[in-house]
């Protein structure tokens, strides 16, 4: 890149610097970023591996989080939001069963002394972010033994998002077995 005239060289240099800046910015940003932020707390005095079964309850999802319309006037997209809690519970059940952490994993049943009960709620549901909080309760005393909070950013496809969240919840359940 040789400059023959005095004015042409700074102009070419500016264009090269601009092109370099734009390429750096485009490579530095991901198309979709599914960053999961989490908080995990285990408060149980008993060893978590002593539990032999897990009951998974549907997470609570209030309609105010995704619509302003009454139930009778929900759009197709808003109607799909009502199915998210059961999809999340089904996926968590599938992932936990695949890891064979517990002898029994179900979505219903009566808790016993060796049962953990997973409960939770959606705290934010939107186009760009889905947040959940969940707790594990001792089956005998209904005392909270563990807590987690997870947020998934840059939500584009709710089906994939629910799959990622359920995998993260199953990972949490697996990790706390050693605490």
Task: Report residues per predicted region.
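Bacterial N-terminal signal peptides that target proteins for export
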Residues: 3-17
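Extracytoplasmic/secreted envelope proteins and their assembly/folding machinery
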Residues: 85, 89-93, 134, 162, ...
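Short beta-strand->alpha-helix linker/helix-N-cap micro-motif
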Residues: 93-112
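Bacterial N-terminal signal peptides
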Residues: 16-26
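Short, surface-exposed coil-to-beta transition loops
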Residues: 128-133
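A structural "domain/chain start" motif
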Residues: 28-90, 145-147, 174-179
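Short secondary-structure boundary motifs at beta->alpha junctions and helix caps
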Residues: 73-79, 137-179
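A short, hydrophobic beta-strand-centered structural micro-motif
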Residues: 54-58, 106-127
């Amino acid at each position: 890149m040789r400059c023959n005239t005095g004015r042409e060289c700074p102009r070419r240099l500016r264009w090269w610097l601009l092109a370099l800046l734009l390429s750096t910015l485009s490579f530095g940003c991901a198309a979709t970023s599914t960053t999961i932020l989490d908080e995990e707390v285990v408060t149980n005095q008993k060893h978590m591996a002593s539990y032999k079964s897990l009951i998974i309850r549907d997470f609570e999802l209030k309609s105010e989080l995704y619509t302003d319309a009454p139930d009778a006037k929900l759009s197709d997209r808003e109607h799909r939001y009502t199915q998210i809690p059961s999809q999340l519970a089904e996926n968590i059940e599938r992932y936990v069963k695949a890891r064979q952490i517990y002898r029994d994993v179900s979505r219903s049943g009566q808790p016993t002394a060796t049962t953990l009960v997973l409960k939770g709620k959606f705290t934010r549901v939107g186009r760009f972010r889905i947040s959940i909080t969940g707790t594990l309760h001792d089956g005998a005393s209904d005392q909270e033994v563990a807590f987690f909070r997870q947020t998934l950013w840059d939500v584009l496809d709710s089906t994939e998002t629910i799959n990622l969240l359920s995998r993260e919840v199953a990972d949490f359940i697996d990790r706390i077995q050693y605490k």
